[in-house]
Amino acid sequence: MNIFRFFEGRVEAALRSLEEEGVLPSGLDLTRVAVEPPRDPSHGDLSTNAAMVLAKPAGMKPRELAEQLAVKLGGEEAVTEVDVAGPGFINLRLNPAFWQARIPEILRSGPAYGASDVGAGEAVNVEYVSANPTGPMHVGHVRGAVFGDALCNLLEKVGYRVCREYYINDAGGQIEVLARSAFLRYREALGEDIGQIPEGLYPGGYLKPVGQALVAAHGRSLLEKDEPEALSIVREAAVEAMMELIRGDLGVLGIVHETFFSELALHRSGFVEQTLKVLEDKGLIYIGELEPPKGEVPDDWEARPQTLFRSTEFGDDTDRALKKSDGSWTYFAPDIAYHLDKYNRGYRTLIDVWGADHSGYIKRMRAAIAGVTDGNAEFDVKICQLVRLFRNGEPVKMSKRSGDFVTLREVVDEVGKDVVRFMMLTRKNDAPLDFDFAKVMEQSRDNPVFYVQYANARIHSVLRNVAEEGTYDLSDGALANADFTLLTDEAEMALVRLMAGFPRLVEQAALAHEPHRIAFYLDDLAAAFHGLWNKGKDDHSLRFIRADHRDVTLARLALIRSAAYVIAAGLAILGVEPTEEMR
């Protein structure tokens, strides 16, 4: 249960009661009424802004309305104290029994705790990774991949129907470079001495198997074909091989896309032209000449009449070109078509996960989607900043041009999938992230993935030891019937309150498209558990197992089993397996 939504309902009921009594006018808009944790925890457990946002439409002073509402809320069974603070905020303190009742609720839910139907089955398209199919995944791709996948998990947790999509950029200039690079490896596989890889081609050895496969499939016949025909065959084979490589790389991170959308297929279908016709019919395309941009002039800017999209009508800084001087499309045109295709497939919420180098593209894309869908699609771009790779504090140097880069598989092989996934979510996506191979494996408080997993392992160690003794029924049903009024220490109650806040945290993280909040929460939850563990070391009366007090033991076992479920629920969103035993 999201206790904050529950109390929003109680506040709303109190307001309706005041309406019936004639204190408030009927028909007030309650959409801005919220119940949240107070900024200062010493002020109470919950706080509502109801009086502040309703006073003006109600024709009352905020504090006057707050005092009347406080009387109503004070009659709630779970409320022990109501305080009107400042100009009219209302702070509530809840009785321990209300908090303690959350433990059996968590035990009944298990790892599904925190799930909700806020999304109501709405279809959401999340496009992430979409790396050019020109080689294996490298460490620069990892953050966006993990972020996008965790975001999908998060949205599904709160009831959205999510499509995990990968856009295959198989129609650009880099694919031409790939084809020529693979053709060179084909000649090498036939026994030719290709010497030094020419500047501008991909030098990585990962294309050697592509060359060998081409020889197995075609023998020497490609050498006898015209270059365009030969390169067309090589291009298709190379892209297919690279996508197979990429799927495998993503698989080691536990990432599986359900939809792969080809840019080349988009062009061949004629849908780019159809999309431009849609924009033309809406009066959003014209022939014009753009002013030169301020500062450094981009390579693709041309001082000539062009086919332009009226991007400024939707908040962009300038209108945008859709065709180049040679008659070919700019990158922008097929991107508009691709997003219209998503919209036509029934998605009204479109989320794109991009690298930091694409941040300047957001305004034009947002403008285009607003224009082509008549403003009926919600479009959100999540930018993932760079990952700086270190080893023992020293930066790891990489160059994709020279083929000297750390691959995704190398990172996962060294530290493990779960460490990689968790660490990629320990910073907000738009903040740079440092990843040190040594530090992420440290068993210390400074390593969040260890700290959270250690809390879970400690819990399972206690439960295993008790199970081996066979003196307690550790089924969830038996634990749910424990006497939770015996949990009176502030550290115990702090842990309960933190767990009770998890459903709200999940909902807010999902609506904000910010899965890193789950990682932050898990660190806080682990800290609360470890704090309780350490108190038990200093004060024997606070130990989880009390040989002299069976009922206290049962209540505490229920408490820590609940904590393990919440940890498991949070880790599942991150795509991380809970560790039950440290090795």
Curated annotation (Swiss-Prot):
Location of the protein in the cell: Cytoplasm
Protein's recorded name: Arginine--tRNA ligase
Annotated family: Belongs to the class-I aminoacyl-tRNA synthetase family.
Superkingdom per UniProt: Bacteria
Main location: cytoplasm
The protein's enzyme class: ligase
Entry keywords, A to Z: Aminoacyl-tRNA synthetase, ATP-binding, Cytoplasm, Ligase, Nucleotide-binding, Protein biosynthesis
Record motif 'HIGH' region, residues: 131-141
Name of the gene this protein is made from: argS
InterPro entries: aa-tRNA-synth_I_CS, Arg-tRNA-ligase, Arg-tRNA-synth_N, Arg-tRNA-synth_N_sf, ArgRS_core, DALR_anticod-bd, Rossmann-like_a/b/a_fold, tRNAsynth_Ia_anticodon-bd
CDD domains (UniProt xref): ArgRS_core
Oligomeric form and interacting partners: Monomer.
Keyword Aminoacyl-tRNA synthetase: yes
Catalytic activity: tRNA(Arg) + L-arginine + ATP = L-arginyl-tRNA(Arg) + AMP + diphosphate
SMART domains xref list: Arg_tRNA_synt_N, DALR_1
Gene Ontology MF term list: arginine-tRNA ligase activity; ATP binding
Pfam families in alphabetical order: Arg_tRNA_synt_N, DALR_1, tRNA-synt_1d
Secretion signal span: none
One GO cellular component term: cytoplasm
A single GO BP: arginyl-tRNA aminoacylation
EC number: 6.1.1.19
